[in-house]
C-alpha cells in the first residue's frame, strides 16, 4: 500500500472526518515507530481509544487499495497504535507547562465537550466540564452499549484528563442547578456542547400505546442498570421473552438489536426504510 511510504495521493485521507494523517502513521506502524505513530495520530484525533472501537471506518471506504482488493485495515491499526501507547506510557498525562489564567466552562461531557476540554486545556486554560448525568461521557457512556464500548475505556481517558488539570462536575444541570448568568460571572468563556437530546418521533396509529420507547432511553436505562447493579436493580426496560420491533437500521438501531437479543428477546424484527443491500455482487459489476 502507498501508506507504507507515507504518501498521500488521490482521496486517501478524504474519507476521515477528522482528517487523520492516515498514511503517515500507517507508515510509522509499518516501520515499527509506535511512539511517533501515536504522536501523529493524536495530532488530529483526541480520542483514538474511542474511534478505533466505534468509528464506521470511513477511511477504509476511501482507501485507494480498495479499488482493486481489500482496503488497509486502518481502524485496526489505529486500535493497535493507541493500545500500544497506553501499554508503553506514551499516552500518560501531560499537563500544560503554562497556564493562561483564563477560565472556561463546558456544558456537556459527550464527544464534543471532551474534545473541547482537551484542546483548551492543552492551550493552558483552566477548564471545568459540567455534566447533568452521574457519569462523564454523554452518549459515549450511556448511548453506546457496554458490549460495543466498554466503559472502563472512557474512565481510563477521563482519569488522564483529570490528572492533566481538567475539572469535571457531574449531576449538575445547568439552567437548574446553576443559572447561565452565574457561569458568565465565574468564567471567561462558556461553551455549549449539550448534544441533540430531542429524538425523532413518528406519526402512526397506536403511537401512544404502552411498550414503545425511544432508542436512547432504552439504551441508557440498560447501561445505567448494568453499571450500577449488574442489571439486578430492575431499573431498565427488559425485552426478555418479548417480540421486539425496532424501527431504524442505523448504528443506534443495531445497538438496540444487540441489546434486545442479549436480554433474551423472543424475537427481534428490524424495520429500515432503505432497500436491502444485495447479498452478492451483480454479474455486471
PLM region descriptions:
Residues 3-5, 9, 48, 56:
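Residue-level signal for mature regions of secreted extracellular proteins and peptides
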Residues 4-8, 21-22, 60, 64-68:
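Detector for the c-type heme attachment site
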Residues 32, 58, 263:
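Residue-level signal for short amphipathic helical patches enriched in basic/charged
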Residues 56-68, 186-193:
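Hydrophobic or amphipathic alpha-helical targeting/insertion segments
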Residues 78-285:
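Residues forming the flavin
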Amino acid at each position: 500500500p502507498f501508506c507504507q511510504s507515507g504518501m498521500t495521493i488521490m482521496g486517501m485521507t478524504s474519507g476521515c472526518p477528522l482528517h487523520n494523517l492516515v498514511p503517515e502513521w500507517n507508515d510509522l506502524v509499518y516501520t515499527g515507530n509506535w511512539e511517533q505513530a501515536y504522536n501523529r495520530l493524536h495530532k488530529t484525533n483526541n480520542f483514538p481509544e474511542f474511534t478505533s472501537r466505534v468509528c464506521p471506518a470511513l477511511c477504509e471506504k476511501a482507501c485507494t487499495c480498495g479499488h482493486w482488493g481489500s482496503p488497509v485495515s486502518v481502524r485496526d491499526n489505529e486500535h493497535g497504535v493507541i493500545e500500544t501507547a497506553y501499554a508503553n506510557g506514551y499516552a500518560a498525562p501531560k499537563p500544560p507547562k503554562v497556564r493562561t489564567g483564563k477560565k472556561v466552562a463546558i456544558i456537556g461531557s459527550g464527544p464534543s465537550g471532551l474534545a473541547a476540554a482537551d484542546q483548551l486545556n492543552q492551550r493552558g486554560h483552566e477548564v471545568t466540564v459540567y455534566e447533568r448525568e452521574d457519569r462523564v461521557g454523554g452518549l459515549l457512556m450511556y448511548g453506546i452499549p457496554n458490549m460495543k464500548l466498554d466503559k472502563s475505556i472512557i474512565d481510563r481517558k477521563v482519569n488522564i484528563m483529570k490528572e492533566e488539570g481538567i475539572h469535571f462536575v457531574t449531576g449538575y444541570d445547568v439552567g437548574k442547578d446553576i443559572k447561565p448568568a452565574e457561569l458568565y460571572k465565574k468564567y471567561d468563556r462558556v461553551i455549549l456542547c449539550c448534544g441533540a437530546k430531542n429524538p425523532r418521533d413518528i406519526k402512526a396509529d397506536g403511537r401512544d400505546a404502552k411498550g414503545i420507547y425511544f432508542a436512547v432511553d432504552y439504551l441508557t436505562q440498560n447501561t445505567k442498570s448494568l453499571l450500577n447493579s449488574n442489571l439486578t436493580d430492575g431499573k431498565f426496560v427488559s425485552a426478555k421473552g418479548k417480540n421486539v420491533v425496532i424501527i431504524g437500521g442505523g448504528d443506534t438501531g443495531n445497538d438496540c438489536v444487540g441489546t434486545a437479543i442479549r436480554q433474551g428477546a423472543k424475537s427481534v424484527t428490524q424495520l429500515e426504510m432503505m432497500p436491502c443491500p444485495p447479498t452478492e455482487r451483480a454479474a455486471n459489476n
